[in-house]
Structures are given as structure tokens and as C-alpha cells.
């Protein structure tokens, strides 16, 4: 059995991989196996990374900021209908309703995103977060916002 020590060198290696990644982020899977019934990961995020607005209908999400400075942004889905002749067009948009500024230096370490809440992140400086969700990967009902 190998114990994983999460230290500055480990986080620096995640940041180096994130810099090489076109998405400007890199995760590290902390699960014991792919069959685990929970999701636990570290995610190194660089400024400019774009995480699509998404939600987890079957799970809340715990987010703990180990280092850096970022916002967890919560949205509500707004549905409107437009009449175009005989056609009714359904339009979906997302309105920001809350912003949680995570910054361990300022004493704001974590947040709990409610089950089913639409959310994303805005990263101001290189940050590493620990994320945890219920359910096996791919089985938590995660879905991206429609355009």
C-alpha cells in the first residue's frame, strides 16, 4: 500500500500538467478503483480555463480550495418561450444567482454546491480544488447546460 502525500511538489506537478493541457486544467483521480461509488479528485485550474455551466442532478458537490483564488458561480435555469408564426421556440438561458469567492488566504476554504444546481468556476490565479460527489463516475447524471 502506498500513501499519497499531497504537498507543494505534488501540486506543482499538477500545475505543470495543466499548463501543457489546452483546457488549462488537470485532474488527479483519488478513487481506489473505477468501481468506487463516489468521485474524489484534485483539480488544478489555471486562469482562462473554461468549465461549461453544468449540474449533477443526483449529487451535491463538495469543493475545497487547497490553494489559489477562484469563484464558484451558481446559476438558475431560465426558460422562456417565443412565438415564431405557428412555431413556439423554447429558449433556455442561465442567470447568475450566487458567487462564492474561495481563497484560503482569506479564510474561505470550501463550499457545498447543492444537488442539481447549475454551476461553473472562474479562476483568478492558479488554484487546486478537492472535489467530491456521490455516485460512480459517469453515473451521477452530470449534464452540461444547453446553449
Give, region by region, the residue ranges found by the protein language model:
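A short, N-terminal "cap"/entry segment at the start of jelly-roll beta-barrel domains
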Residues: 1-38, 52, 85-102
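Double-stranded beta-helix
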Residues: 6, 14, 79-80, 85-105, ...
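Short histidine-centered beta-strand/loop micro-motifs
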Residues: 30-33, 43, 51-56, 64, ...
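Short, charged/polar surface micro-motifs in flexible loops or helix N-caps
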Residues: 35-38, 46-50, 67-71, 78-79
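Conserved short histidine dyad/triad with adjacent acidic residue
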Residues: 42-58, 78, 102-104
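A short, compositionally biased micro-patch
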Residues: 46, 56-58, 65, 106, ...
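Short beta-strand His + acidic residue motifs that chelate non-heme Fe in jelly-roll/DSBH
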Residues: 52-54, 72-73, 111-113, 119-124, ...
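Glycine- and acidic-residue-biased ligand/ion/polar-headgroup-sensing regions
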Residues: 58-80, 84-85
Amino acid at each position: 500500500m502506498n500513501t499519497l502525500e499531497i504537498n507543494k511538489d505534488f501540486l506543482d506537478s499538477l500545475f505543470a500538467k495543466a499548463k501543457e493541457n489546452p483546457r488549462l486544467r488537470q485532474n488527479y483521480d483519488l478513487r481506489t478503483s473505477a468501481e468506487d461509488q463516489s468521485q474524489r479528485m484534485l483539480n488544478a485550474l489555471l486562469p482562462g480555463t473554461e468549465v461549461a455551466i453544468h449540474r449533477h442532478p443526483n449529487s451535491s458537490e463538495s469543493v475545497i480550495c487547497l490553494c489559489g483564488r477562484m469563484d464558484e458561480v451558481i446559476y438558475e435555469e431560465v426558460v422562456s418561450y417565443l412565438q415564431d408564426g405557428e412555431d413556439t421556440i423554447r429558449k433556455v438561458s442561465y442567470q447568475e444567482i450566487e458567487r462564492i469567492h474561495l481563497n484560503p488566504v482569506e479564510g474561505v476554504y470550501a463550499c457545498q454546491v447543492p444537488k442539481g444546481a447549475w454551476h461553473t468556476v472562474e479562476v483568478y490565479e492558479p488554484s487546486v480544488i478537492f472535489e467530491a460527489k456521490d455516485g460512480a463516475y459517469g453515473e451521477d447524471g452530470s449534464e452540461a447546460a444547453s446553449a
